[in-house]
C-alpha cells in the first residue's frame, strides 16, 4: 500500500466525464497554460509597476514570477488567515497588487474578503487570487485575476488556469506555443504500471519526475497547455474528486482528534481539502518514518529565506508542518493505514 507522492495515470481507466474539471471551470472562460507558473507570469505582465504584497507563506515560484516588481510580505495568523491589521498597515498608493492565497482547501473568511474589497476601492490595487488550494471549494472569491495550478489535484502532466474579470490579452495567449509534456505523462503511466505489479520501473519513473520538475524550475518560456493534458481535464470527475477528499479528510480528522491533534486550517464541511495539514513536534523525523511505510508527505513549503524577518510563520511552517495525503486515490483502508502508522509514531507527532 502506498499513499502520497506523484499521481499515476491509468490509461485503461480514462473516459470523458459529465461533471469534468473542464466543465466545472467553463463558466470562468480560463486560459490554460502548461503550468500555474506560466499562468502567473502571464498575469504579472498586466499589472502596473509598483509593490506587490504577498502572504508570508508562499511557494518560491510565486516570488520568482513577480521578480520584476518590488515585493513586500504581509503576515498570516497561525490558522493561515490573513492578518488584516498587518496587511492594512502596508497599503499605500505604491501597491499595485495584493496576492490573496487560500490554503489547503480553506477559503479566507468573508470578513477578511470584505475588508480587502474596501481597501481595493480606497487604494486602487488589483487582487491576484491564487485558487490552487481552493479551486474545488470555490472557483473565485474577489480576485481580479485568478491563478490555479491544477496538477496539484490529479494526474495531469502539466496544467495551470488563468481567469477572472480583469483577464485580457487573449490574443497574445493564442500566439503561445503548446507544451509537449509526453515525458512526464510517461512517468505517470510507468508509476501506474509499477503500482499494479506489471512493470518494475520504480527508479525510472522517479527519475522522470525529478528531471521534468527540474526542467520546469528552469523554464523561462510561456506555453499553452498540451493537447493531452487538456484532454485529461475532461476525464476527471470534479464532483467525485471533492466527495472522496471530503470523506477521507473527515475520517482522518476524527482519528487525529483521538490523538489530540487537529488540522491547522479551519476547513468547512462543504469545502474540498487539498491535504490535511498538522503541526508536528519533529516533522523531519516523522516524515522519514512514514516514508519507511510508503507514505509520502509533501512539504509546504521549503523556506526560501527571502525577507526572513518579515515571515516568522513561514519559517515555522517549513520546519514543523506536515501535509497528510487524503486525495481521491484513497479509500477507507488507506486512511486507516495512515492513521495506524501515525499512531505508531505519535511520539513524533505531538
Locations of regions flagged by a protein language model:
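PLP-dependent aminotransferase class I/II
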Residues: 6-8, 13, 27, 31, ...
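PLP-dependent aminotransferase-like
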Residues: 13-24, 29-30, 38-122, 134
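Short loop/helix-cap segments at secondary-structure boundaries that form the rim of catalytic
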Residues: 22-25, 62-68, 136-143, 194-199, ...
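Short, charged, surface-exposed secondary-structure boundary motifs
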Residues: 80-86, 138, 155-161, 308-311
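Helix C-cap/helix->beta junction micro-motif
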Residues: 122-123, 293
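Active-site PLP attachment segment
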Residues: 143-198
Amino acid at each position: 500500500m502506498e499513499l502520497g507522492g506523484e499521481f499515476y495515470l491509468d490509461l485503461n481507466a480514462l473516459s470523458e466525464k459529465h461533471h469534468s474539471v473542464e466543465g466545472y471551470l467553463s463558466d470562468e472562460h480560463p486560459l490554460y497554460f502548461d503550468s500555474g507558473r506560466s499562468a502567473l507570469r502571464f498575469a504579472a505582465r498586466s499589472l502596473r509597476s509598483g509593490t506587490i504584497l504577498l502572504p508570508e507563506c508562499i511557494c518560491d515560484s510565486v516570488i520568482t514570477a513577480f521578480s520584476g516588481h518590488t515585493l513586500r510580505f504581509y503576515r498570516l495568523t497561525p490558522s493561515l488567515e490573513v492578518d488584516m491589521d498587518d496587511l492594512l498597515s502596508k497599503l499605500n498608493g505604491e501597491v499595485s497588487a495584493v496576492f490573496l492565497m487560500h490554503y489547503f482547501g480553506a477559503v479566507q473568511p468573508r470578513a477578511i474578503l470584505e475588508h480587502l474589497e474596501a481597501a481595493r476601492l480606497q487604494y486602487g490595487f488589483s487582487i491576484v487570487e491564487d485558487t490552487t488550494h481552493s479551486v474545488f471549494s470555490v472557483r473565485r472569491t474577489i480576485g481580479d485575476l485568478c491563478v490555479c495550478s491544477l496538477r496539484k489535484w490529479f494526474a495531469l502532466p502539466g496544467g495551470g488556469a488563468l481567469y477572472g474579470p480583469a483577464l485580457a490579452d487573449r490574443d497574445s495567449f493564442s500566439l503561445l506555443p503548446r507544451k509537449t509534456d509526453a515525458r512526464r505523462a510517461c512517468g505517470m503511466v510507468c508509476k501506474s504500471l509499477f503500482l499494479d505489479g506489471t512493470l518494475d520501473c520504480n527508479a525510472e519513473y522517479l527519475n522522470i519526475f525529478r528531471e521534468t520538475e527540474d526542467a520546469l524550475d528552469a523554464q523561462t518560456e510561456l506555453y499553452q497547455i498540451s493537447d493531452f493534458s487538456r484532454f485529461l481535464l475532461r476525464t476527471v470527475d470534479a464532483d467525485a474528486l471533492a466527495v472522496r477528499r471530503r470523506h477521507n479528510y473527515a475520517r482522518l480528522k476524527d482519528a487525529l482528534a483521538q490523538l489530540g491533534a487537529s488540522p491547522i486550517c479551519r476547513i468547512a464541511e462543504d469545502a474540498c481539502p487539498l491535504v490535511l495539514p498538522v503541526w508536528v513536534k519533529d516533522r523531519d523525523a516523522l516524515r522519514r518514518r512514514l516514508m519507511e511505510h510508503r507514505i509520502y508527505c509533501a512539504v509546504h513549503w521549503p523556506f526560501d529565506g527571502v525577507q526572513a524577518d518579515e515571515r516568522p510563520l513561514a519559517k515555522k511552517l517549513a520546519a514543523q508542518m506536515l501535509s497528510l495525503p487524503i486525495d481521491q486515490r484513497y479509500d477507507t483502508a488507506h486512511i486507516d493505514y495512515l492513521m495506524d502508522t501515525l499512531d505508531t509514531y505519535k511520539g513524533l507527532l505531538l
